[in-house]
Amino acid sequence: MKTTRYGSKKNKRLRISVFVLLAGATIISTMTSMGPDSLKSSAQRSQSGPARQRAREAGVAVGVLPPGQLNAITDVAGVSVGHVTIIRGDNVRTGVTAILPHGGNLFREKVPGAVFIGNAFGKLAGSTQVNELGEIETPVTLTSTLNVPRVADAVIDYMLALPGNEDVQSINPLVGETNDGYLNDIRGRHAGREEVFAAIRNARGGAVEEGCVGAGTGTVAFGFKGGIGTSSRKLPPSLGGYTVGVLVQTNFGGVLTINGAPVGRELGRYYLKEELETKSSTNPGLANNPDGSIIIVIATDAPIDHRNLQRLAARSMMGLARTGAAGSNGSGDYAIAFSTASDLRIRTAANSRNQKTAAALLSNDAMSPLFLAVIEATEEAIYNSLFRATTTTGRGHTVEALPIDRTLEILRKHGALGH
């Protein structure tokens, strides 16, 4: 743990404690100098309870394809993830998550990329250039809605400062968001340069922290605590042996369905419940709000270009639908996909106008197994975001975690555990 003190005009000294967790995860809890007990209790109020199992560990096996070794987006070689979780006082529950396609200079070694929009009620900065040029040139960062401009500005600063970028005059930061305003002081715009730099610099391969971490700290899904989730699928050698990894930031609603079982309905928490039962919506509960958004980040080592990456991203929406998402008017549903295939990197030097690419690409016919892989990985990543999240309090509101024991009972009842 590293503790740094900062001066403040309005407060006394601020104490910022940074805890390094899995895959570069960091928690920043800021309090006025009231002693370590108050700092500890603040973090405990926001993220209470012991670590919870992932969906597969609890017996929920999704689909037919096997997961990668970590069952995470980091199963795609070279991909790393970093989180900064911001917990301050009683009202700040937010953060930043960074996904790096590789560990080099992304501007000088761009990766093929694409964005697919399921519903465009969102602020995905940088998406138009990605789809125009078919390239991603910065880390993919996720945050809270009103933090997008601040995070984008910080990503630009980070990229401009990299050795080799001294002559760069245009940067396209790719920043996704969901609205965490129910639990978080969203108007405070608490993620800035320091947090973004920390998320990028702390990014690591290996196991990825899930649940109430990074950009998922203050999110809500299906009326329960949402967050960050990840999963992967590995194709057999006969199909190329490629890996597809997915990371999600869940903050949307609907009627939670797990492996086809009506979990949300049997838990009594689902979209339109009040209208269907009382014919009125004068006092709708949290689960009755389907809005909020989801960002789906997809990585693969398969050699596919922008066109087929966009097709891959589109199929992730089928995995989203499998979970019971309502696809509401107010939910910004976005998928970002990139390939890490080294032969497809767009290498740019100061004078590279005549660069040619001649890499072999997968055919359209070879895409179908990858489509199934991304559907399954997206579905399981969403479940992991719910299974790993913990009950969280912020801004006077408490959002309960998905009750795992009761959920497993429902799944057993419907024969939805295992294969």
Tell where the protein language model's regions lie, with residue ranges.
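Low-complexity, intrinsically disordered short segments enriched for Gly/Pro and polybasic residues
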Residues: M1-T4, V20, P36-D37
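Ala/Thr-enriched low-complexity intrinsically disordered regions
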Residues: T3-T4, T30-T32, A43
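Short, hydrophobic alpha-helical membrane anchors of single-pass surface/secreted proteins
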Residues: L14-V18
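Alpha/propeptide regions of enzymes that mature by internal proteolysis
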Residues: L39-H419
